[in-house]
Amino acid sequence: MVLSFSETVNGTHANADQIALRSQAISGAVNYTVLGGATLEQAGCPPVLKLELAQSDANAIKNVVSLAAASSSTYLSLGSSTVAGVDGNSIVAISSGAAVPVSSYTADSTSPTLLTFTINMNTNNMMMNFDEPVDVGAFNANSTTIQGPQSEATGSSVSLTGGSAVVSSDGLQVML
């Protein structure tokens, strides 16, 4: 995320936790305040700050379907202590009702990757862990195949024929 300012800012004392992404420029819209772990890097002219979100923040934003899903659902509000000008003056806060729309938007084009899975044959449950949130509504259990070792010549496998999927609140785990 790149934030542009009307004058040079002092990025050494920037507070990422004063930044909130919003789905609309109205009070009561879906929003997400950056929790921390984000890194801010000051760049030259024009006066900009580059914000690299912590993975936990990026995943949390992706997990809110109506937030930052397109340019039409991506707005930003800032607290006055987000950053100061080089003269020490605080920036003008941008309230939730006056949130600024994104000027350039790049959609997430990276598909989630399965990291690990566990299976419990006593409870008939399988837990799959992904590297980013998944949309349980688009998850198709019938597209899941469990196979034996790749080195096995017979290539034994079983394709699932049903079951219901439940996703964890952070979107990173799916239980069948």
Describe every region a protein language model picked out.
Residues 1-176:
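Non-catalytic beta-sheet/beta-sandwich ligand-binding modules that flank or precede catalytic cores
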